[in-house]
Every structure is written in structure tokens, then in C-alpha cells.
Amino acid sequence: MFLIVGLGNIGVKYHRTRHNIGFDFIDLVSKKYNITLNREKFKGNYGEGFIGQNKVILLKPGTYMNLSGESVREAVNFYKIENDRMIIIYDDIDIDIGRFRIRHRGSAGGHNGIKNIILNLGTDVFPRIKIGIGHPNVDLVSYVLGKFSEDDRINIEKVLKTSVEALECIMDFGIEVAMNKFNGFKL
């Protein structure tokens, strides 16, 4: 069983913003594999289903970004998920739009949602897919809570589709294979 967590903020005003790319990812996986997030628990919305032969739980924390670790910890404890069976998807300002990176461990890199997950789990060793949203030329908060331009949104949709393939690869073949295959990806 895998726990797949997309990070974002709840509420209509955050829908499809740069900081909600993790929610966009979960929406795409949910649609592709017909997994409905119609249950409320773990301080968030979740659904269970299958991606190929892999049983998965898709989770969107409902705690706002900075407290995402509370939701993740509750789901991890309930399902007794091992760290290598939990995959977190989130935005990264240090990666250009049109790219993403897969990592199996690492610091929060200034991302408050990841910082809170590390705090709540007591480890930074867990797989993650970091989707590039580009570096701002303006105030960071305004940038991450802003929406993509029309052209950038088109590119983000392509990146999301490829990052779903990366998720499938992680589950089927392991994170090292996925990192070797996808970390050079660029539109």
C-alpha cells in the first residue's frame, strides 16, 4: 500500500495556484484511476483505490500548507505506512517550470509544508516529487499564491502528466529507477 499526498491549501481562492500543484497532481491521479476523494479523516480528504496492482490512498491535507504534517502523520499512523511507501508531491521554487525532481530524502528547502511533515514524522527520509514552479521576481508569498500564466499552465499540465508516470515508476520499480529515468526530464 502507498500513501500519495499532494500538498496545497484548501479553499476556492487557492484553486490552481502555484502552491497548490500537489492538489492538482492528486486531482489528475484521481481522475486517471477513478479514485474518488470522498472521505474525510486525517484532517483532510482522501480516497482509496488502485494504480495498476498497487493499492493506494490519495490524500489532500485540509490543514493548510504549514500544518500538512499533522494530516500526514495521522494517515501514516492509521495505515502503518513505512516511509518508503509514502510519496509527497509539492511545488518547488528552485526548479524551473517544465521540470520536476524526484528525491528519496532531504531538507525542506524552505517549503513550510515539507518542514512540518519532517517535524511530525521525525525524519526527512521519504520519497517526494518536487514540481518546478520557477523562481519569483516578486514577493515570494504573492508568487506562490498566484496563478500560472496561460502558457505556464499548459506546460504545468504536461509536467503533471509526466510526473504521474514517475509516480507509477516509483511504485512499480523503486525510487532509484524513477530518479534515473525522470530527473533529466525537461519540456
Curated annotation (Swiss-Prot):
InterPro entries: Pept_tRNA_hydro, Pept_tRNA_hydro_CS, Pept_tRNA_hydro_sf. Keywords: Cytoplasm, Hydrolase, RNA-binding, tRNA-binding. The record marks N9 as: Discriminates between blocked and unblocked aminoacyl-tRNA. PROSITE patterns: PEPT_TRNA_HYDROL_1, PEPT_TRNA_HYDROL_2. GO terms for biological process: protein quality control for misfolded or incompletely synthesized proteins; rescue of stalled ribosome. GO terms for cellular component: cytoplasm. It is found in: Cytoplasm. Belongs to the PTH family. This is Peptidyl-tRNA hydrolase. It comes from Clostridium kluyveri (strain ATCC 8527 / DSM 555 / NBRC 12016 / NCIMB 10680 / K1). The gene is pth.
